[in-house]
């Protein structure tokens, strides 16, 4: 960031007329890097809180509906939710909220990137679809929260590294999001795994969470 700003200052000081043309480009890059640094700081802050937040009773159905409502205003993506009333678990609510937001946001970004690439190639436009399901797991005593989309999915080469710290396919990603999600879930005796969506042909992330004991 510092080098780019210094370069811009030198161009202006030396009377280089190109500095005005470079201003927008460098400003956009500086803002992108600032956002990335902020994301990194937030990710490490989340790591620090993993051991300090006390578990509380959480209504999964209500929490998921609240988070979906934050995203369900786009014209280019359709959301569908299949819930389960009375699905309660114990966990740190702010951290679980972060997990769900991260997974939804990843799906949104993957779809929007695919839509943009299709437009650049002159390909056929498509409406994104994200389906989130909350249901009883086939594993006794657990709930499954399934996040599916019709984006490009994850390549076979990248699947093994999905939850590895610092691995990302995003140009401005920190590579900590899914790694932190897994750490949060492991602290709750939960797990997360990836598969290809059979119905939508894109990504499918399943969070398997232990039911609250009565």
What kind of feature is each model-predicted range?
Residues 78-88:
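Conserved catalytic submotifs in the C-terminal HATPase_c
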Residues 177, 181:
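Short alpha-helical Gxxx[C/S/T] motif in the catalytic ATP-binding
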